[in-house]
């Protein structure tokens, strides 16, 4: 049996742009992608903290160091620039792998700069 497990999480990213006229996807600063072990075209879940919307799309790489978080196409209707979002990717593994798996979690400040990277997340606790 394969389990779907959290692979990567970018916590409290600030949406910098919403581009309705783009084909689709989310553009993420390549530096943030690399830090979170996210690759281009990977499926990603976007959770908007400000309005509760959840959606899935795929990732395209933005300019390294740009701090861009831009929802494109139809996804742009679900967010506003300035909204805080949680970005999550998942992986499949068997139960034995899942027992020892640790996701990568990166925390961003209001400018989308990384202030913490961890592989541990429990309710109310960060290491």
Swiss-Prot record:
Gene Ontology CC: one annotated term: cytosol
Modifications after synthesis and translation: Is synthesized initially as an inactive proenzyme, which is activated by self-cleavage at a specific serine bond to produce a beta-subunit with a hydroxyl group at its C-terminus and an alpha-subunit with a pyruvoyl group at its N-terminus.
Xref: Gene3D superfamilies: 2.40.40.20
Protein name stated in the entry: Aspartate 1-decarboxylase
Organismal lineage: Bacteria, Bacillati, Bacillota, Clostridia, Eubacteriales
The entry's keywords: Autocatalytic cleavage, Cytoplasm, Decarboxylase, Lyase, Pantothenate biosynthesis, Pyruvate, Schiff base, Zymogen
Binding residues for substrate: 57, 73-75
SUPFAM superfamilies per the UniProt record, alphabetical: ADC-like (SSF50692)
Modified residues (Pyruvic acid (Ser)): 25
Catalytic activity: L-aspartate + H(+) = beta-alanine + CO2
Keyword set includes Plastid: no
SUBUNIT field: Heterooctamer of four alpha and four beta subunits.
Annotated metabolic or biological route of this protein: Cofactor biosynthesis; (R)-pantothenate biosynthesis; beta-alanine from L-aspartate: step 1/1
Family, as annotated: Belongs to the PanD family.
Pfam families: Asp_decarbox
Cofactors that this protein relies on: pyruvate
PANTHER family in the record: ASPARTATE 1-DECARBOXYLASE (PTHR21012:SF0)
Location of this chain's protein in the cell: Cytoplasm
EC number, as in UniProt: 4.1.1.11
Function: Catalyzes the pyruvoyl-dependent decarboxylation of aspartate to produce beta-alanine.
Gene Ontology BP annotations: alanine biosynthetic process; pantothenate biosynthetic process
Textual note on the cofactor: Binds 1 pyruvoyl group covalently per subunit.
Record: active site: 25 (schiff-base intermediate with substrate), 58 (proton donor)
InterPro entries on file: Asp_de-COase-like_dom_sf, Asp_decarbox
GO molecular function, one term: aspartate 1-decarboxylase activity
